Each structure stands twice: as structure tokens, then as C-alpha cells.
Curated annotation (Swiss-Prot):
Location(s), subcellular: Membrane
Residues binding heme, per UniProt: C457
Consequence of gene disruption: Completely abolishes the 11'-deoxyverticillin A production.
Transmembrane residue ranges: 5-25
Cited Pfam families: p450
Cited function: Cytochrome P450 monooxygenase; part of the gene cluster that mediates the biosynthesis of 11'-deoxyverticillin A, one of the dimeric epipolythiodioxopiperazines (ETPs) from the verticillin family that act as mycotoxins. 11'-deoxyverticillin A is required for normal conidiation. The nonribosomal peptide synthetase verP is speculated to be responsible for condensation of amino acids to form the carbon skeleton of verticillin, whereas the cluster-specific tailoring enzymes are involved in further modifications leading to the production of 11'-deoxyverticillin A.
Listed pathway(s): Mycotoxin biosynthesis
Molecular function GO labels: heme binding; iron ion binding; monooxygenase activity; oxidoreductase activity, acting on paired donors, with incorporation or reduction of molecular oxygen
Protein name: Cytochrome P450 monooxygenase verB
Enzyme class: oxidoreductase
Upregulation: Expression is regulated by the cluster-specific regulator verZ.
Family statement: Belongs to the cytochrome P450 family.
EC number, UniProt record: 1.-.-.-
Species of the source: Clonostachys rogersoniana
Length: 514
């Protein structure tokens, strides 16, 4: 008996797999003769049973040792189902001045996460607002972070410390960072809004989780996965909930601005509004825009605010966690940092002000060393090629390709740093002058923690300052140890783009002096 449904199913499946394979072939052809590490046959790649999936650190190290060390490019198959082209060390000098019209970081983020499905991130208002406003308001931002940290840390950690029970450090620090960052991203009232905090944290976790499944399915089925999968629904529902909090705040801010009212406290939302006004995207005269255009701009505005929450908290949470972990495993370092902080505070009447934090060169060196060894970036200077170009080496870059630099491997290369695999908290500290030899945020071809060139992370100064304040507050208030004291600091998680602290690694804290 004929079974037409079975024949149709087989045919449809064959067509889907053929289209998916042809997409891979197209992407592979775009690479030309560039060698690929960790690649495998179509079937094993499709079910993600390759060496890249099981031991990516080994794969990327092999590519670096075999090709990068000989000034040659290589590529690997990323989790976004496309190749990432790893340029040879030193290529950063050639591309560092190229703007987003030629090499675009935000487009690379879009291509890697497909934010276009749910969030508009390609407008540059959030990036330009950070670049134009954060550094000149740094003193006020410093005060905001200190105040909110002093309010929040005891609430989150004192009961945990009193219980003497192990807890997942990263997850609690993650929550702390979201509370503190909300105060200067959207407004202090959001720090106490548990529904907003739950939604933004959920969004930040579920977007990467969704994308992992989205890119796992063959190309022709991805739109269906977005609309029909539980994971896609969770992202859509979470974003809709976030908009119920953020859109009214944007409307309120625009209305106050149109009426000539000015906020006494800095927020990135306010800075973005000023920038949008400069660009003519939002008008001070309410009658100068149609209702439809205003609604469109508010929708874009809210998307940019949501993405900023996604983009800003993760690196700081990782940094604070890594600093805490390194301090927990080195009691002498903990003692030295506490003494330095104590002296800096005494010199400033106990105030955690900018001047006090400027008197902590050991902390600066320690922070830079943690960035060198512990990420959070595995790759840096990541860009999507917007138009075909050729490097001086003769390497041709095709439009649509994603390029990057092997920053973490460069940081751990003995040719760049003596005893590179050893964590030395004083590597960038000069004891004879009691000063850092290189500032935490200074980039070079051998230090790419925050990128390089004109598209370096514009929020790096605030990110470092916030990380140091939160870590220092924890260090001065609590003693601690790893739950598994014998095992010590747990190994980092190395993914195809990041070096992360283990999310569930547990520590035990205790109030100092108690």
C-alpha cells in the first residue's frame, strides 16, 4: 500500500538538508584556501559531535600554534553556523582605524546572535552615547556605583555569610551587577523593581540559550524554530515584559525633556535621548513628529536600552567573579590588597571616592592580569566585513565574513609575556615607584581585552571602575574560601568566543570580624 505521506516526508527532509548543505558549501567557498581547524563532515557538524564541540580550547590552540605563530590566518566553524576568520597577530594594526562602514563590530554581534529576530541593535545611539557621555560623567557615575553597592551588598550577601553555607558566587554577583547597573542605565527606581530585574536577567540568559538551538536546526527551519519553539516564545515574552517597564520610562523622560525639565542624576537613557535629539530622531517640539514616527523611535529606543542591559552586565559580573576567585586562592594577595585599600581610604577620610581608588596600583595590576589570564574574551577585535577588501599581506576579505583576533591566546603566549601561564598579580606593578607600569584599560597588539582601535569597547573605563569597586567592597567586608578548598579555584569555561568563570562554582563567605 502506497504511503504518500512517507514519500513526501522523505522528499521534504532531503530538500531541507540539501539547502542546509549548500549554505555550508557557499560559506566554505567564501573562505577560499584559508585552512579550517576542527571541521568535520556535514553529518557530524549538524549533530554537533565534533572536536570543536567537545574540546574547543584544544582546537583553537592548535590553530594558533600551527598558523597564527607563522603569521597565517585560519578559520573555525562557529556556533552561529558560519566560519570565523582568525587573522594573524599584528593584523590589528592594519584594521584598527577602519570604521563601521568597512568593518563593523555591531554587525558581527548581530550575525552571531541574530538579534534582528527580536531586538534592533544596529542603530548606534547606545554606543555613541556611551562614548560621548560616560567618561565626562565618570565622577558622578563613580558615586552612583559606590552608593548602590553600599546599599545592595549587605542585603545580598550578609545573610549568606551568616549561614556559612556554600553558594554560587557568579549567579549572586550577576544579580548584584544588574541591580547596580540599572541605577545608571535607566534609573534608580529600577534597582528595587524585582520584576524588571528578573526580566532583564532572564533575557540575558535566554538569548544565548535560544541561539544555540536556533543555529542547531537546518537553515530552512530556523524561522519556524523562532516562532514555534518554547525557547523562541520565552525570548519574545521576556522582551515584551521588559518593554512594559522601559517604554513608560522613555515616554516620561521624553515628556520631561520636552517641557524643559532636566534630571539631576545621570542615566544612559537620558544621554541617549540627548544624542537622538542631536541627530533629529526625536524632536523637542511634540508637534514636529507624527505619532507614528514617535512610536517608531520609542520602539527603537527601548530595543537599544534592552540590548545595553544585555551587553553591559555580563563582562562586569565575569570580572568581579574572577577577581574574587583569584583573591580567595591567594591569602597573601588578599592581605596586600586590603592594606592598600585601607591606606587609600584613610588618606581620603574613609570615602570611597575617585581619589581613593586612584591610590590602588596593586589593584590595577591585579585587574589587568586577570583580564589577561581570565578573559572574558577569547577572541577580540571581532568585525563583520561590510565591503570586500585586501590586507597588505594579500589576504582578501569577502563581504559578510566575520574576522577576529585570538586575544586570549596572544595573552597566554610566552613570546609576549614571561611565564605567561602563571598568574602574577603584580605583573604590571612597579614596587620601586608604587605605580602601575601599564593602565588597566590600555590596549596594545599584545593586550586586546577590550578590543583595539577606533571600535574599542567605549564602556571599558566604567566597566573596570565598577568591577573594582564591587570587588573591593566584597573584599573589605567578607572573608571567604572555596566550598571545595582542596580543589581550589575552578577551571574557566572556554567557549567559541569567551572565557568564563564556572557559573555554579560555590564559595563560602563570612563577615570579617564576626
Amino acid at each position: 500500500m502506497a504511503r504518500p505521506w512517507l514519500s513526501a516526508s522523505v522528499l521534504i527532509t532531503a530538500v531541507i538538508l540539501l539547502v542546509d548543505y549548500l549554505n555550508y558549501y557557499r560559506l566554505r567557498k567564501r573562505l577560499g584556501g584559508i585552512p579550517v581547524v576542527g571541521d568535520a563532515s556535514y553529518f557530524w557538524r549538524r549533530i554537533r559531535w565534533t572536536e570543536s564541540d567537545t574540546n574547543f580550547q584544544k582546537v583553537i590552540q592548535h590553530g594558533y600554534d600551527t598558523f597564527s605563530k607563522k603569521a597565517k590566518p585560519f578559520a573555525f566553524w562557529g556556533q552561529h553556523e558560519d566560519f570565523i576568520l582568525v587573522l594573524p597577530p599584528g593584523s590589528c594594526e592594519e584594521v584598527k582605524h577602519l570604521g563601521p562602514e568597512k568593518l563593523n563590530f555591531l554587525q558581527a554581534v548581530e550575525d552571531s546572535y541574530h538579534f534582528k529576530l527580536h531586538t534592533n541593535i544596529l542603530g548606534r545611539s547606545h554606543v555613541d552615547a556611551v562614548r560621548q557621555s560616560v567618561n565626562k560623567n565618570m565622577n558622578q557615575l563613580h558615586e552612583i556605583v559606590v552608593k548602590k553597592a553600599e546599599e545592595t551588598i549587605p542585603k545580598l550577601f550578609d545573610d549568606i555569610a551568616a549561614s556559612n553555607e556554600p553558594f554560587a558566587a557568579f549567579l549572586t554577583i550577576w544579580h548584584l551587577v544588574h541591580i547596580v547597573s540599572a541605577s545608571y542605565l535607566v534609573g534608580t527606581e529600577f534597582c528595587a523593581n524585582e520584576e524588571y530585574l528578573q526580566a532583564i536577567e532572564y533575557y540575558c540568559i535566554n538569548v544565548p540559550n535560544f541561539i544555540y538551538g536556533y543555529f542547531w536546526v537546518p537553515v530552512p527551519l530556523r524561522r519556524l524554530y523562532w516562532y514555534l519553539s518554547p525557547q523562541g516564545y520565552k525570548v519574545r515574552a521576556c522582551k515584551a515584559k521588559l518593554k512594559t517597564f522601559i517604554v513608560p520610562k522613555i515616554r516620561e523622560t521624553i515628556s520631561a525633556w520636552q517641557n524643559g525639565q532636566k534630571s539631576s542624576s545621570y542615566t544612559l537613557l537620558g544621554a541617549m535621548l540627548d544624542l537622538k535629539a542631536q541627530k533629529g530622531q526625536i524632536k523637542r517640539d511634540p508637534t514636529a513628529m507624527t505619532k507614528a514616527e514617535l512610536e517608531r523611535q520609542i520602539d527603537i529606543f527601548s530595543d537599544e536600552m534592552i540590548f545595553t542591559g544585555f551587553d553591559s552586565a555580563g563582562p562586569v559580573a565575569c570580572m568581579v567573579t574572577q577577581l574574587l576567585f583569584e583573591a580567595l586562592r591567594d591569602k597573601d594577595l588578599t592581605k596586600a590588597l586590603r592594606q592598600e585599600l585601607k591606606s587609600a581610604l584613610e588618606a581620603n577620610n574613609g570615602q570611597w571616592n575617585v581619589q581613593a581608588m586612584n591610590l590602588t596600583p596593586k589593584l590595577d595590576s591585579f585587574t589587568r592580569e586577570s583580564l589577561r589570564v581570565n578573559g572574558p574574551t577569547l577572541l577580540s577585535v571581532t568585525r563583520t566585513v561590510m565591503e570586500p577588501m585586501q590586507l597588505k599581506s594579500g589576504l582578501s576579505l569577502q563581504s559578510g565574513s566575520i574576522i577576529s583576533s585570538p586575544s586570549w591566546l596572544i595573552h597566554n603566549d610566552e613570546d609576549n609575556y614571561e611565564n605567561a601561564h602563571q598568574f602574577d598579580p603584580y605583573r604590571f606593578y612597579n614596587p620601586s615607584t608604587n605605580a602601575v607600569t601599564t593602565k588597566v584599560t590600555t590596549a596594545s597588539t599584545n593586550f586586546l581585552g577590550y578590543g583595539y582601535g577606533t571600535q574599542m569597547c567605549p564602556g571599558r573605563h566604567l566597566g573596570i571602575k565598577m568591577s573594582q569597586i564591587l570587588f573591593s567592597k566584597l573584599l573589605m567586608r567578607y572573608d571567604g574560601e572555596f566550598a571545595d578548598a582542596k580543589a581550589g579555584k575552578p577551571a574557566n569555561i572556554v567557549t567559541s568566543g569567551q572565557v568564563l568563570p564556572p557559573y555554579y562554582a560555590k564559595v563560602i563567605l563570612k563577615r570579617r570580624g564576626i
